[in-house]
Amino acid sequence: MQTYTYVSKGKFELMEKPNPVLIDERDAIVKVTLASICSSDLHIKHGSVPRAVPGITVGHEMVGIVEDIGSAVTNVKPGDRVTVNVETFCGECFFCRHGYVNNCTDQNGGWALGCRIDGGQAEYVRVPFADQGLNKIPDHVTDRQALLVGDVLATGFWAARISEIKEEDTVLIIGAGPTGICTLLCVMLKNPKRIIVCEKDKGRIRFIHEHYPEILTVSPEACADYVRANSDHGGADVVLEVAGAESTFRLAWECARPNAIVTIVALYDKAQTLPDRKSVV
């Protein structure tokens, strides 16, 4: 089958590989019907994901049809349309039982697909722990609609969940790409007092104005002053940084009030340094 493969830093190639087979009784084989590119794939290409293994098929955002299942898989069957979770997790270790599935201690736990084991930029993919990592797609939901569920929407949901958002809060979201919009949708479920989205792309700003007219928007250059003028305590109560640039990492702290919650949703190509306290709000 054709696969898109991480060869070395800066180099991906379309390569021929054998179809995957069941290795563990908890595995499933999924025929990929639709996949998308994540910015994390670009971080792998840039060499900024240390655990990424050269030679693996990249891709962790996909939907498909279950082709085969191991003997211990009970939640899905061949022929089911499914989303594939970016995280593979055993569901049994300490971290899984406490909801921190990204830290699953199994060798295939956490972000394995498309990073440490072959992922979904291929015709077929083997999914470990299929009962945890596959979800059936309802008949009325298209593959295109479901494609966001396994990673981008789940990332936004998790970010909103851990940010302890309260109804009296001013929430700043930095970045309005696909993950930023999904984060916005999940933050809206928390009903904070106001939501501000910082974005430089005019098309993305227009999209927010058309679909979510109640949301405030601001450019990065004006963001710090705008947030201070449109918040109750000299800065945002909660900041979610989804853009992933060095400048936006710094901006997150500049816009946060004292004792705010800053949630880093993005990945970065290099280590970031917290700004000096004197230079922020």
Where are the language model's segments positioned?
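NAD(P)H dinucleotide-binding glycine-rich loop of Rossmann-like/cofactor-binding domains
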Residues: E92-I174
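Short glycine-centered segments of the SAM/dcSAM-binding site in methyltransferase folds
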Residues: R81, T170, A260-I261
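Glycine-rich beta-strand-centered segment in the early N-terminal region that forms part
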Residues: P20-A35, S48-R97, P138-V141
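Mid-domain Rossmann-like dinucleotide-binding core that forms the NAD(H)/NADP(H) cofactor-binding site
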Residues: K136-D225
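Glycine-rich cofactor phosphate-binding loops and adjacent beta1-alpha1 units
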Residues: S163, M188, I205-S279
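Short Gly/Pro-enriched turn/cap motifs at secondary-structure boundaries
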Residues: V7, N19-P20, V53-G59, L113-D118, ...
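Short, flexible surface segments
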Residues: N75-P78, E167, P258
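Cytochrome P450 core scaffold surrounding the K-helix E-X-X-R motif
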Residues: S40-H46
